[in-house]
């Protein structure tokens, strides 16, 4: 049995050997904490392995006990392995948590979850505490005032430096008007407290009883404005409802009942002084003031009506007494009233005329009062002329008999009084408006004649042909002035006076002349207006007068014709324009019939002509401006094909072509130059440069180039273009004589002359006609000779 048990122990230990190996691997990864545990586990493993080699004969008497001890060691080893694994796992988890990378959103989310507040719950009193009143400072029975600063200093030792004057206005009680200001403040406070409020908190501060059943702290003391209907349902006070004290709110079926609190108002001086007063049940001072106001209006109503009626009657009487006439001249409605006034005026006019002296002290004042009369007559004269308009002819005026001989004086006096009335405001009770029959008539020296036409009856002078014989026989007691002349007839005025005539609708307000918007609008309407872009159709109207046609048909203005005529009459001698210089302003751009033409590129003394490199003809047509293109491949400056060559004009009846030295006939024209080597100047046959004006006008020009300035000094048409690869090439070389004469013109190849130099022949000899090859060899020889002859 013992042997069998030992073998079983061995098999169990062998089965557990893989776990030991895994535990050993884990221990190697653990730091200082698992080192001791690993050592103990290794020792136990050695003990277990030693049991395997124990002989069978020795497994007696305590071997089983040893095996039992070893098995217990194995069990402890397994438990230690679990502990080590747990320790290593926790260490790894801590390291992984520390090494996790988090974003700001994740960190803020964790902070929100950590600092998240708990859900607020509504406080509900316990059932057993429902009848207990809430304690407050107002319920203290002692009369000792509570001082928060003294309490803090007593309990916490904090001494306050609070100064009330820093936060409120300081009251100066020693001011002499302090009592008056206090009474005024008390009155304002009572007025404020007498107003009706829907705020429960304000009502509570005023000492009113508030039924707070069904209301919480938010409803009572919150600053949120609730609807008026909701607040009224919970508000109970003496000012709002007196008969419904026991009425409960309908919105709450079983409100939580609290005992009524004893409300004590704060110790404010404005409230303490009138604490014994209740809310005003009767209408306040506002209602009394309103009653007094309405009573005053009722009493003032009849008085105002009487005053208005009296004023209207006075104006009516005044207008009737001053009535001049209606619009219809056939109905003299005011004849009697005018006659009565006339009789009274005749009695006092002699006295008034005798009293009128230049030294009268009242006269300056009357002149000042008469000044607005002139302006009134000037304004009314224009309207009278428009309405009246010479309705009655002179013949009708002659037919009417003059029944009242004294009408001229009456009309003049009445017009004077009317002018004074119209010049000022209409006030019936004013003394200045009453007719003053004693007023003297102003003399012509003291009365200014108005520049504008005056009314017909008073200020219009009578023409000689309109005067009647009866007028001459009427004696006049008053001196008539030029501006006040009567025609012997009571001609009714068409100007409306007060209530007799219709109000003229032609009167324009004076303020409109000073209206900025009106004036600017009139100027804008009178100015030429251009249609807005959005008001134009998408297609423009085209025609001979349209803007597009006008611009297209326009020509630049200038006296170009006179300039042409002046240039033709006085032709100027053309001068040579050096490179990199401006063209003379007086020189015309094109030759006139009387002006010889000098082609561009005329040889300048000191410079050699630039010869073109031979190139093939291009397909480009000749330039319309007369400038040949680069297709002209010539060894000399010959014109293009199709253009007239420049002809040499001999001066003063000399032969056109000088005789040649060899007697073979005329040589090449002197205008064709033979290229010279070594920078020598090419001249004519006799070695003298041609004179100015020896070129006949032609349609083209010679292609002469300036080698010292390079290709940049040439025009675009003179630059060669290689048609093979499409790129410009600067292959113009002065010393490449073989290329220069390889493609020479047929007209000049037969008559080329050698250039004069120190080693060549004399200029009088002429070279015989040679072929292209001979010419090339000869040119190369001349070039080498020229180079040797250079200093």
Curated annotation (Swiss-Prot):
Location in the cell reads: Cytoplasm
The Gene Ontology biological process terms listed for this entry are:
mRNA metabolic process; regulation of translation; stress granule assembly
A GO MF annotation of the entry reads: mRNA binding
Location, primary (coarse class): cytoplasm
List the InterPro entries hit by this protein, alphabetically. Answer: ATXN2-like, LsmAD_domain
Matching entries from Pfam families are given as: LsmAD
Q: Where is the composition biased (Low complexity)?
A: 76-96, 473-486, 715-725, 734-760
Null allele outcome, as annotated, is:
Impaired RNAi-mediated heterochromatin silencing.
Which UniProt keywords are present, listed alphabetically? Cytoplasm, Translation regulation
Instruction: Output compositional bias ranges, type Polar residues.
Output: 1-22, 326-337, 487-497
Bias (Basic and acidic residues) occurs at 112-125, 243-256, 360-371, 395-418, 774-791
* Region feature (Disordered): 1-28, 60-100, 112-134, 235-311, 326-423, 452-505, 613-634, 707-791
Q: Which GO terms describe its cellular component?
A: cell division site; cytoplasmic stress granule; cytosol
The record describes the protein's role as: Involved in post-transcriptional regulation of gene expression, probably by association with mkt1.
Q: To which protein family does this belong?
A: Belongs to the ataxin-2 family.
Quaternary structure annotation from Swiss-Prot or TrEMBL: Interacts with mkt1.
| Name the record gives this protein | Ataxin-2 homolog
Per the UniProt entry, what species is this protein from, by scientific name? Schizosaccharomyces pombe (strain 972 / ATCC 24843) (Fission yeast)
